[in-house]
Curated annotation (Swiss-Prot):
Entry-linked Gene3D superfamilies: Glycosidases
Any GO molecular function: 6-phospho-beta-galactosidase activity
Catalytic function, reaction form: a 6-phospho-beta-D-galactoside + H2O = D-galactose 6-phosphate + an alcohol
Pfam families: Glyco_hydro_1
UniProt record, GO biological process: lactose catabolic process via tagatose-6-phosphate
InterPro entries membership: 6P-beta-galactosidase, Glyco_hydro_1, Glyco_hydro_1_AS, Glyco_hydro_1_N_CS, Glycoside_hydrolase_SF
An example Gene Ontology CC term for this record: cytosol
Keywords: Glycosidase, Hydrolase
Domain of life: Bacteria
Lineage of the organism: Bacteria, Bacillati, Bacillota, Bacilli, Lactobacillales
Active-site residues, as the UniProt record annotates them: 160, 375
Protein name according to UniProt: 6-phospho-beta-galactosidase
Root EC class: hydrolase
Amino acid sequence: MTKTLPKDFIFGGATAAYQAEGATHTDGKGPVAWDKYLEDNYWYTAEPASDFYNRYPVDLKLSEEFGVNGIRISIAWSRIFPTGKGDVNPKGVEYYHNLFAECHKRHVEPFVTLHHFDTPEALHSDGDFLNRENIEHFVNYAEFCFKEFSEVNYWTTFNEIGPIGDGQYLVGKFPPGIQYDLAKVFQSHHNMMVSHARAVKLFKDGGYSGEIGVVHALPTKYPFDANNPDDVRAAELEDIIHNKFILDATYLGKYSDKTMEGVNHILEVNGGELDLREEDFVALDAAKDLNDFLGINYYMSDWMQAFDGETEIIHNGKGEKGSSKYQIKGVGRRKAPVDVPKTDWDWIIFPQGLYDQIMRVKADYPNYKKIYITENGLGYKDEFVDNTVYDDGRIDYVKKHLEVISDAISDGANVKGYFMWSLMDVFSWSNGYEKLYGLFYVDFETQERYPKKSAYWYKKVAETQVIE
């Protein structure tokens, strides 16, 4: 049976400042930790990325032509405040005014994120969000943006609080590159959630027009053997690390007893303790019913198996299928069923996981109000032939995920839009320019854009709301 989506559904494309803009030191932009980190540790940098800083009119014209009526954009904090605080950079402010004006001219609604992995270097080297002073700096930055950019109708505080902490302190593939420090992961998540809550409360108290929410990456976690209580426990603990801890903070304004039992177990086994203060919970509680929407980024699910051994994580950065490894002491290890498809980067393709995650939010956090799927897409080694990419695998991936969104809506979930990652090809944080996701192919040498087969397919779905 052919499935459909509502008439007012947003068919969007997603970007992020650092992954798309290039121009990393142009017009007064301050440095971010990624600048030197990529130079020192990877085979690529954020120059030129997709040169969105100069070519956004081209990308927004393409968006309009291909039925994309929403775009996720992030503001680079260090374009506004080069050191994260203090003096404002007027050229950075002007750039985003021009960008948002172009969005509205092209009838592409901007959904604007304040922080997408790119804390200014001056604050990052001072502890980033492990340093509580950063909460104040973020709230001040947020307030400036709310006042300055009144043309923005949809605000997101953070993109993917979970993967920020994981990347920085667990997997160690984001600066500062620390591995296996679970206490830092949870503390970073907590402090960012307090920052989020304070910014949301400020937005509502300030009477600013528009809506505000947060974007969480929510990979669904399943037990490898649902009949084995140890596997069930492993999945629950892994879910706490990646999903439940931040969802509780967002919508309960506290951590449930079950969540804290899991956190305490993980820290008992791995060492470290948390600094959770009374005023933090006052802030979380004050914001728990003020979120206008939840953004869910969903790419994959994981299966967890009980495991008794030391932590070891191997990140598959170059698309060498089967080279990744993930096992955490006192938690479990990832072990997927053999019949579940994976990408070359070992990301598990499982659309049902998106349905299950949406329905979990609906059941466990009934004050969620509404959901946007703010990222979903297929990373692929695209082949450019005949001035296009015949990306049938991407079409199949997106189609199956749109179908389960349609199912979730039919089953009572309030899902209002979908943003494909990514609008045009961008560079990937820890995979470089080989892992591509865009609707529009980017020749990174000439910066020419070419619509892929998926762009024509997406246009038809956006125009008809029929998934076929």
